[in-house]
């Protein structure tokens, strides 16, 4: 079994195509279920964010599983296969581990080093566990990836060195409304991105911050945390009319802020800066044509964030990821031989027990003390004979290459494959 990643992100596809792949909760669960139901897949989950969709699966073969999983992504986008495939990327086995660690460490994010990916990865793990499609392999992999992501941020300044998506968008808004100090800001949404937006603008001396969300309870909680006020979605048009800056980042699947709403809000000729950080977009793109209105979307920010240089911090995180990948793969290779080693020692124990029974039947009057000494001696002989091969096979398992030393050991000692498979695979790799 090996891990397969099939994905698409801001690095491989335009935002317009990513919008077609946006998933709500039920849609995400259905995709995970569909992947898990594929013929060659035994475990599955999906990382879905505003700028990436990545399917992680434990598979029993490469080519068949790639075709199956890629087809699910193509079908989700509603695109022709030939139009979609060039934007997909595939990572397998060791490469899949390396890719996930880079993603969770923030190296692959649109805003390098951003911390939201940690929560999004945890959400992917939780979703798979809730549905029942995440088993030991993906659980171990994702748990370790989360530890790597936390280590990267604890030991470096990667999350502070690079600008966040919100900060970059606010910097772009200066051309229209100037500094945020004294401005009225409207945040639409109450998820993790909205939380980041609210905390960021609240720290910049704004005159007021208002949080609007479809679910009033979520808006109330977010507003209370940052000293803002909350409003309902029914009040959106009225709130637009008094805002200087709008940051929209909901999970809605349709246009939330229409051209007519913005036109009505700016009828007096005032300037309005709108930052649309949602995928699919919350704001009608044509509002950018209205007088005094500026619109900044994810497409506008992509190149700017890609070119930002976190310098030494990025390099430090890369080194951490390299170390962690090597350690994880080493532990995984050693764990892969454990069932064979356990089965071999179990076979040796069975042989010793059978021979002792044979000795007892042939020498019925054997003294108990002598019998115990013989048993002890035979066990020591068996242990010494097996010690070097089992230690060496663990050492050799650390070496990369195509040779399967566990398979060779099983073949040499004629181990029953069912006995090997019956050994529980360790789940505590660190």
Curated annotation (Swiss-Prot):
Membrane-spanning residues: none
Active site: 50 (nucleophile)
Site (Important for activity): 99
Disulphide linkage map: none
Binding-site positions, NADP(+): 189-194
InterPro entries: 4pyrrol_synth_GluRdtase, 4pyrrol_synth_GluRdtase_dimer, 4pyrrol_synth_GluRdtase_N, GluRdtase_dimer_dom_sf, GluRdtase_N_sf, NAD(P)-bd_dom_sf, Shikm_DH/Glu-tRNA_Rdtase
SUPFAM superfamilies: Glutamyl tRNA-reductase catalytic, N-terminal domain, Glutamyl tRNA-reductase dimerization domain, NAD(P)-binding Rossmann-fold domains
Gene Ontology biological-process entries: protoporphyrinogen IX biosynthetic process from glutamate
Keywords, sorted A to Z: NADP, Oxidoreductase, Porphyrin biosynthesis
Entry EC no(s): 1.2.1.70
Oligomeric form and interacting partners: Homodimer.
More details: During catalysis, the active site Cys acts as a nucleophile attacking the alpha-carbonyl group of tRNA-bound glutamate with the formation of a thioester intermediate between enzyme and glutamate, and the concomitant release of tRNA(Glu). The thioester intermediate is finally reduced by direct hydride transfer from NADPH, to form the product GSA.
Function: Catalyzes the NADPH-dependent reduction of glutamyl-tRNA(Glu) to glutamate 1-semialdehyde (GSA).
Domains as described in the record: Possesses an unusual extended V-shaped dimeric structure with each monomer consisting of three distinct domains arranged along a curved 'spinal' alpha-helix. The N-terminal catalytic domain specifically recognizes the glutamate moiety of the substrate. The second domain is the NADPH-binding domain, and the third C-terminal domain is responsible for dimerization.
Protein family membership: Belongs to the glutamyl-tRNA reductase family.
Name of the protein in question: Glutamyl-tRNA reductase 1
Source organism of the structure: Nocardioides sp. (strain ATCC BAA-499 / JS614)
């Amino acid at each position: 079994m090996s891990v397969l990643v099939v994905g698409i992100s801001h690095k491989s596809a335009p935002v317009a195509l990513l919008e077609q792949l946006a998933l709500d909760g039920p849609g995400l669960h259905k995709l995970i279920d569909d992947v898990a139901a594929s013929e060659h897949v035994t475990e599955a989950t999906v990382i879905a964010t505003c700028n990436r969709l990545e399917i992680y699966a434990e598979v029993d073969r490469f080519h068949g599983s790639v075709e199956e999983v890629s087809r699910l992504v193509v079908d989700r986008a509603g695109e022709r296969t030939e139009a979609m495939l060039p934007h997909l990327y595939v990572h397998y086995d060791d490469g899949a581990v390396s890719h996930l660690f880079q993603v969770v460490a923030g190296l692959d994010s649109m805003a390098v080093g951003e911390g939201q990916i940690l929560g999004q990865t945890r959400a992917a793990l939780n979703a798979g566990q809730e549905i029942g499609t995440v088993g030991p392999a993906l659980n171990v992999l994702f748990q370790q990836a989360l530890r790597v992501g936390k280590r990267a941020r604890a030991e470096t300044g990667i999350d502070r060195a690079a600008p966040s998506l919100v900060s970059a968008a606010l910097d772009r808004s200066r051309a229209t409304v100037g500094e945020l100090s004294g401005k009225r800001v409207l945040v639409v949404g109450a998820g993790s991105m909205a939380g980041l937006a609210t905390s960021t603008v609240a720290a910049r001396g704004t005159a007021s911050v208002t949080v609007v969300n479809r679910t009033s309870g979520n808006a109330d909680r977010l507003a209370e945390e940052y000293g803002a006020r909350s409003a309902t979605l029914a009040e959106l048009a009225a709130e637009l009319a008094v805002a200087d800056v709008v940051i929209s980042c909901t999970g809605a699947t349709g246009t939330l802020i229409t051209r007519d709403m913005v036109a009505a809000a700016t009828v007096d000729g005032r300037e309005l800066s709108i930052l649309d950080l949602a995928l699919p977009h919350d704001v009608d793109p044509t509002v950018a044509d209205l007088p005094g209105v500026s619109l900044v979307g994810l497409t506008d920010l992509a190149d700017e964030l890609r070119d930002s240089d976190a310098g030494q911090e990025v390099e430090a995180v890369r080194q951490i990821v390299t170390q962690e990948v090597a350690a994880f793969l080493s532990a995984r290779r050693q764990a892969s031989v454990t069932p064979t080693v356990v089965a071999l020692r179990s076979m040796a124990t069975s042989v010793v027990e059978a021979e002792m029974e044979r000795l007892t039947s042939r020498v019925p009057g054997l003294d108990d003390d002598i019998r115990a000494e013989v048993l002890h001696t035979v066990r020591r002989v068996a242990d010494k004979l097996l010690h070097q091969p089992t230690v060496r096979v663990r050492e050799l398992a650390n070496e990369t290459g195509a040779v399967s030393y566990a398979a060779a050991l099983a073949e040499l000692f004629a181990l029953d494959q069912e006995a090997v498979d019956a050994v529980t695979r360790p789940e505590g790799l660190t």
